Amino acid sequence: MSRSGVSVADESLQAFNDLKLGKKYKFVLYGISEDKTTIVVKETSTSQSYDEFLGKLPENDCLYAIYDFEYEIGGNEGKRSKIVFFTWSPDTAPVRSKMVYASSKDALRRALTGVSSDIQGTDFSEVSFETVLERVSKSAGSH
C-alpha cells in the first residue's frame, strides 16, 4: 500500500513476472484504476520497437511502464538486456494525476524486484532511446 492508499493488483505483478521470467512481453504499461485504489495493467506488448513503446506514452496523462531494454555492448560482447521502470509524468498532465502517480510509485516499484534502472520522464527527450541507453549502460558498469 502506498502513501496515497493505492495498492498493486495481482495482475500487475503477474505481467511483470511474465516479462522478466517468461520473456512473454517486451513492455507493460500500468495505470491507476478509475476509482484510484489500485495499480492495474493498461496494456502489454511483444513489439520490439522502442518507437512503438514511446508512441504509447500519453501526451497529457501519467503512467508507469516496465520495458525489457536490449542494447549492444561494445567490443563484440553481444547484447545485454535490462529491465527499466518508467514513471511518465508529462508537464501537461493534470496536477492531481501527477500527485497521485508520484505518491503511488513506491508501492509498485517495491513490488517489482529485478529492475535495473528507474527513469523519470516529463517529456520525450528524457525517455529517448539514447537517454535510456546512457542510463542503463552506466548502471551496468559498461561504457
From Swiss-Prot:
GO molecular function terms noted in the UniProt entry: actin binding
GO CC, one annotated term: actin cytoskeleton
Domain annotation ADF-H: ranges: 5-137
Keyword Transcription: no
Compartmental location: Cytoplasm; Cytoplasm, Cytoskeleton; Nucleus matrix
Gene3D superfamilies according to UniProt: Severin
Keywords: Actin-binding, Cell cycle, Cell division, Cytoplasm, Cytoskeleton, Nucleus
InterPro entries, alphabetized: ADF-H, ADF-H/Gelsolin-like_dom_sf, ADF/Cofilin
Gene Ontology annotations of biological process type: actin filament depolymerization; cell division
Family classification: Belongs to the actin-binding proteins ADF family.
UniProt protein name: Cofilin
Species of origin: Zygosaccharomyces rouxii
Gene: cof1
